[in-house]
């Protein structure tokens, strides 16, 4: 069973003996863990000797009217799940422990990368992600940290943060873990009704179809996107965004497609009470 710490000073003291030689991995989560989170721990164990999992529903990354109050808190169940995959420590701080003053006077702004995709409709979200991840990095001082690729934009922002703030931390992006029908695993999937859960896999199916169309290069990108948006909307989703970007999240058009080895199709869409995120990498065949 992993050791649980609720205070920064206690966790630091527990980790101090490991600073000299063993590698420490951090897996940041908001709890309500599923198989996708457990796979992050499995990956972390491949790269480190000690694995710390943080469980903290971070208020600074939620906007007005979002689901901060209703987000599931399931600490006991989470710790039991983490025991099955061999996590060593759980850090589950209170809000007061993480933020003596709320909102925190110090902020971390990641620049233009936050102004697109999720950042368009959640303008303060990545500011909150930046401050909490920076605090966790400072508290745990890991050698490696593991994040899921489902939150593709977040992963890109964290890589930028590590580079710009000179953290000596290896960031590992873990492949998306999916249900048998293709739906990307997410704690918010439990918001879906039974009928919505049957519809939800259509999102991934559309991403795969769109990726194939991009590689076939039979139609302009904007035509492909328009048709895909119409299909997704007709299935019952409310689209926040559906966009094609370079792997580095810069803009791409028909003239510049062949300049890149890889593109990514990203989507955020509402279905009932759930906001679903997914993405699909697209390898460009330059011979076509």
From Swiss-Prot:
Gene Ontology MF term list: ATP binding; pantoate-beta-alanine ligase activity
Metabolic or biological pathway, per its Swiss-Prot or TrEMBL entry: Cofactor biosynthesis; (R)-pantothenate biosynthesis; (R)-pantothenate from (R)-pantoate and beta-alanine: step 1/1
Catalytic activity: (R)-pantoate + beta-alanine + ATP = (R)-pantothenate + AMP + diphosphate + H(+)
Protein location: Cytoplasm
Gene Ontology CC: cytosol
InterPro entries: Cyt_trans-like, Pantoate_ligase, Pantoate_ligase_C, Rossmann-like_a/b/a_fold
Protein name (database record): Pantothenate synthetase
Record's keyword terms, sorted: ATP-binding, Cytoplasm, Ligase, Nucleotide-binding, Pantothenate biosynthesis
Taxonomic superkingdom: Bacteria
Binding of ATP, residues: 30-37, 148-151, 177, 185-188
E.C. designation(s): 6.3.2.1
Keyword check for Nucleotide-binding: yes
Pfam families xref list: Pantoate_ligase
Stretches that traverse the bilayer: none
Function: Catalyzes the condensation of pantoate with beta-alanine in an ATP-dependent reaction via a pantoyl-adenylate intermediate.
Miscellaneous comment in the UniProt entry for this protein: The reaction proceeds by a bi uni uni bi ping pong mechanism.
Broad class of enzyme this protein falls into: ligase
Assembly and binders: Homodimer.
Record: residues binding beta-alanine: 61
Recorded family membership: Belongs to the pantothenate synthetase family.
Active site per the UniProt annotation: 37
Binding site for (R)-pantoate: 61, 154
Source organism phylogeny: Bacteria, Pseudomonadati, Pseudomonadota, Gammaproteobacteria, Moraxellales
């Amino acid at each position: 069973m992993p050791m649980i710490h609720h205070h920064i000073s206690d966790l630091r003291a527990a980790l101090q003996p490991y600073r000299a030689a063993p590698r420490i991995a951090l897996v940041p989560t908001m709890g309500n863990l599923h198989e996708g989170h457990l796979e992050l721990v499995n990956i972390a164990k491949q790269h480190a000797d000690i694995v710390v999992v943080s469980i903290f529903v971070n208020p600074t990354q939620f906007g007005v009217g979002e689901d901060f109050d209703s987000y599931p808190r399931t600490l006991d169940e989470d710790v039991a799940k983490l025991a099955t995959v061999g996590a060593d420590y759980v850090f589950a701080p209170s809000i007061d422990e993480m933020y003596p003053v709320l909102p925190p006077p110090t902020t971390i702004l990641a620049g233009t990368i936050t102004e697109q995709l999720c950042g368009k409709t959640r303008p303060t979200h990545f500011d909150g992600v930046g401050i909490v991840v920076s605090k966790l990095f400072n508290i745990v001082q890991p050698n490696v940290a593991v994040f899921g690729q489902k939150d593709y934009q977040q992963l890109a922002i964290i890589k930028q943060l590590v580079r710009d703030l000179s953290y000596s931390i290896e960031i590992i992006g873990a492949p998306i873990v999916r249900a048998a029908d293709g739906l990307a695993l997410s704690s918010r999937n439990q918001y879906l009704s039974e009928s919505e859960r049957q519809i939800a896999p259509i999102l991934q199916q559309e991403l795969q179809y769109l990726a194939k169309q991009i590689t076939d290069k039979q139609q302009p990108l904007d035509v492909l996107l328009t048709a895909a948006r119409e299909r997704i909307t007709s299935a019952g989703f409310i689209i926040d965004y559906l966009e094609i970007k370079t792997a580095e999240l810069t803009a791409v058009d028909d003239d510049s497609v062949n300049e890149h080895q890889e593109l990514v199709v990203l989507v955020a869409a509402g279905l009932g009470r759930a906001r679903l995120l997914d993405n699909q990498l697209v390898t460009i065949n330059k011979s076509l």
